[in-house]
Amino acid sequence: VTLRDYQEGFVSKVRELFASGRSAPLLVAATGSGKTVVFSYIARSAATIGRRVLILAHRDTLIKQASRKLTDYGVEHGVIMAGFTPQHHCRVQVASVQTIVRRLDKLPYRFDLVVIDEAHLSAAKSYLTIVAKLRESNPKLKILGVTGSPVRLDGKGLGSHAGGLFDDLVEGISIRDLIDQAYLVQPAVFAPAEQVDLSQVKKVGGDYDSGALAEVMDRPMITGSAIDAWRKHCPGVPAVAWCANVAHAQHVAAEFTAAGIPAVALSGDDDGAERERALAGLASGAIKIITFAMLLVEGVDQPAIGAVILLRPTMSLSSYLQVIGRGLRTIYAPGMPIATVEQRRAAILAGPKGAKCYVLDHAGLTFKHGFADDIREWSLDGVVKKKGKKKDPKEEGPAVAQCPKCYHVHPKAPVCPSCGHVYE
């Protein structure tokens, strides 16, 4: 296994913190940075010296993704989830949070290291219960959390001082850095001139109620605008569309299909094989659009996705960044060297995807949360701050401009970087 330079830095920093007496660091690294690669490497290293490792995830897609990566690394492991035969002899176990919380009293051994994937979820009672029980059998238990964003909708911090699990923060690598190093492509945002009015949409648990949101977003005018935008800015480019709920996703897929653009809606009711077929269809060109509500927010690695259509307003910065991340993965031209930044850039430009991902923002998320590649400061307190000079407190939202000619959304500048329009 060969780690990238920055991934080696993650591993070294985590080891340094454990050696210094920290027991529960949280690694924050952008979608596409290879967090699964890093924690699989750490798990393998721990198992090699006789430690028992538990990897926790909350979705079957994430569990299977971790299992595949461990298999790639030659790590014998068990999967603790409904439908899998227990492999108790394995030192590494990948587990569903929902399954293991029910089997805590039946575990035949203690663990030395717990890895928590999507660790921004770990403030939930189920995670805290699991860790407390595992610490009863091993007071020296170490924890490693990994996440792309430690900010939660409920405002809870993830630090132990705030009732969370973690005692230190490892700031990994940002989307901006990954783009600059040619490990991700650049998002190019376009949005309609008019933003949707959400003032009457009720919120539940800190975010918009999906049913009420669908009533606002699931309208022919909005869907038609998204279809027109895809045809104008990125015709033929494989895309995923994030929708308010499953019914909305089905309606959007039907509208794209009716417009002569092959589309399919995916939901949690679809089995894994159906998801894989749809994603493969996107890569082959048989399908142009996959619509979804929450299914593809996490755990999807399909580099062919070249456009992300945002049709779901959200208060969740974490979900927003994850969805944009679905389209930022690179496709390097086969056979070209990719050892240096310059080589990777050349291989991206020569590849079938190119150097950008189109973000068609019909949900106003860029105006709400800023650009996906903005540099953010993270905290275990749950507070997120944008780096850079302070803005006028009267100024609301990020420093975003929208070109009146091509509707490109970009950081404020005197000239539109897309069409060259000069702002007055």
Question: Which role does the model predict for each range below?
Answer:
Residues 36-38, 45-72, 246-247:
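Conserved Walker A/P-loop ATP-binding site and its immediately adjacent core
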Residues 64, 78-89, 250-257, 261-297:
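Conserved helicase ATPase core of P-loop NTP-dependent helicases/translocases
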Residues 82-113, 124-129:
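Conserved helix/coil segment N-terminal to the catalytic DExD/H
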Residues 96-101, 113, 268-376, 380-381:
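Conserved RecA-like P-loop NTPase helicase motor core
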Residues 120-189:
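Post-DEXD/H (motif II) to motif III coupling segment of the RecA-like Helicase ATP-binding lobe
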